[in-house]
Amino acid sequence: MSRSPLIARTVPALRRAADNLRKRKATIALVPTMGALHDGHVSLVRLAKRRASRVVVSIFVNPTQFAPTEDFGAYPRTWKADIAKLAAEDVDIVWHPGVEAMYPEGFATRIVPEGPALAGLEDRFRPHFFGGVATVVGKLFTQCRPDFAIFGEKDFQQLRVVTQMARDLDLGVKVIGSRTVRERDGLAMSSRNVYLSPQERQTATTLYRAMKDSAGRIRAGEAIASAMARGAATIKAAGFVLDYFEARHAETLAQVTSRKDGPLRILVAAKLGTTRLIDNIAV
C-alpha cells in the first residue's frame, strides 16, 4: 500500500526531514526533477530506491536555466499527477520550493562550470543553461545533503557537468546516471513530448533511427564523418532544424575522428516545429 510523501516547501523543513532520516542511519538518494513526471522519472526513482534506503524527489521548474525566449512559462506543471506517481513509488520526501525559497531577495551567487564537459554542444546553443543547472543542483545538494543523486542519461552533457561539479566542489554526493527510457518506437521519454502534434510525434522517431543507423555504420567500420553526415541528412530531410548531431568521446565529450579515440557517444539536438528535442546513444 502506497503512502503519501512528506512535502517540504522551505529549506529548514527539508533539512529537518532529511536530518531525521539520517538520525535513523538512513542513506538518502536525491532525484532532481522539474515535474511533469513520466515513466522515465519513475525509473530514476526506482534506481534511487535500489541505491539508498530513503528517497527525496525535488520538483522545481528552475527559471535560471531558461533563456527569455524559451518555454519557462509554458513548461508543463502537473503537481497532482506528480504527487500521485511519487506516492505510488513510496517516495519519502518531496522537495517543492517556490522561486523565493531557491532564489530569495538579494541572491547573487552563481556556479559557472568550465572544462571539457563544456564541449560545444548544449552550451553552444544555450549558453545560459549550464550555469543555471549547476547553480540549482549545487543548491539542491547542499540543501538535502544526499549520499547519491540520480540523473537520466538522456541529458548526457548535463550528467557530465553535474558529475564534474560534485567532484570539483567536494560536495560528497555520488552522481549516478540512469539509462534513457524510451517509448516503444524509440522516442526518448521527455516532459516536452506533450508539445508535439500527432504528425510531429510520428516524425520525432527519426532522431533515434538516425542515431542507431550512424552508430551501426561506425561499428561496421565506416568513417565517423561519413556516418554522421548521413544521419544529419536524414534528420534534416524529415523536417527538423538541426542544432548538432555529433559523435563524441563518451567520458570527456571531446571531439573524435576515429573509433580508436575511445568509447563513443552520439548526441543530437534538433527542433521540430516549436519543440526542441535532445537524445543520445552509445556507439
Swiss-Prot record:
It is an enzyme of class 6 (ligase). The active site is at H41. It is found in: Cytoplasm. It catalyses: (R)-pantoate + beta-alanine + ATP = (R)-pantothenate + AMP + diphosphate + H(+). One of its GO terms (biological process) is pantothenate biosynthetic process. (R)-pantoate binds at Q65, Q158. Gene3D superfamilies: HUPs, Pantoate-beta-alanine ligase, C-terminal domain. The keyword Iron does not apply. GO terms for cellular component: cytosol. Its EC number is 6.3.2.1. InterPro entries: Pantoate_ligase, Pantoate_ligase_C, Rossmann-like_a/b/a_fold. Pathway: Cofactor biosynthesis; (R)-pantothenate biosynthesis; (R)-pantothenate from (R)-pantoate and beta-alanine: step 1/1. The keyword Ligase applies. ATP binds at residues 34-41, 152-155, 181, 189-192. GO terms for molecular function: ATP binding; pantoate-beta-alanine ligase activity. Beta-alanine binds at Q65. CDD domains: PanC. Keywords: ATP-binding, Cytoplasm, Ligase, Nucleotide-binding, Pantothenate biosynthesis. Belongs to the pantothenate synthetase family. PANTHER family: CYTIDYLATE KINASE/PANTOATE-BETA-ALANINE LIGASE, PANTOATE--BETA-ALANINE LIGASE. Homodimer. The reaction proceeds by a bi uni uni bi ping pong mechanism. Catalyzes the condensation of pantoate with beta-alanine in an ATP-dependent reaction via a pantoyl-adenylate intermediate. This is Pantothenate synthetase 2.
